[in-house]
Amino acid sequence: PQPMKAQLDKTAHYYDLKTHPGQVVVLKMQVKNLTQTTKTVRMIPEPARTNPLGDVVYDRTVGQAINPRLGFEKLATGTQKMKLSAGQTRYLTVKVRLPKTMGNGVIAGGLHFQEVTAQRQRSQQQMLANRYAYVLGVVLHTGYVKKVAKVNLQARTMGHQIGIGINNKANQFVNQVKVTQTVKDARGHVVHQAAVQGKQLAPNVTAAMTLDQHTYQPGDYQVTTRFTSKTVHQTVTNNVKVK
């Protein structure tokens, strides 16, 4: 992506822009062919979605669209195709037209770049199956952008596993998320530790997840969960019973 003054997170490798209702957001990017042969590339705008774990994903077969009423694919320039000779760099412009009546909120999507091959041109099904070769994320904020300072956390049992329920009530993404859990038995001995990191939590989402596939014997456990991100740092301790 080309740098923009409206970029909120200067360290992000995707568009994270402050916008306003009615604005036409112009996204400029360069596409380079690093191979020694001519390539044809197709760009397709798609909405961002939330999977059952609360993660932001760009696969239209998974989960629910983020802000479906204002679908990113409806607002952005349609599919574009370009041919690049070996080593060639070309510039691509995508316009996103924000409704004047949209109010405050977040619109999220992805620009999907894929190589077009003769096989994909012959088979639409094959093209769809391989459409997510590379995704450039786009997050557009209108109104006051409030940093997420807290999420709701609650350890819970899922059969013979121990996981965590997460609720992000804010209309903002939570980036660079790391979740760790330390589980102690009734005698206070640490019986298991687990962690996941690199998650991006969607806005207005409630999700439940386990950090790994570890199973527990029936009994009482104390679970300490630590949730950290760019703006959130919190720890909660809960008692749970595995039956």
Residue spans of the language-model regions?
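Short, solvent-exposed loop/turn segments enriched in Ser/Thr/Gly
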Residues: 22-28, 90-92, 104-110, 160-161
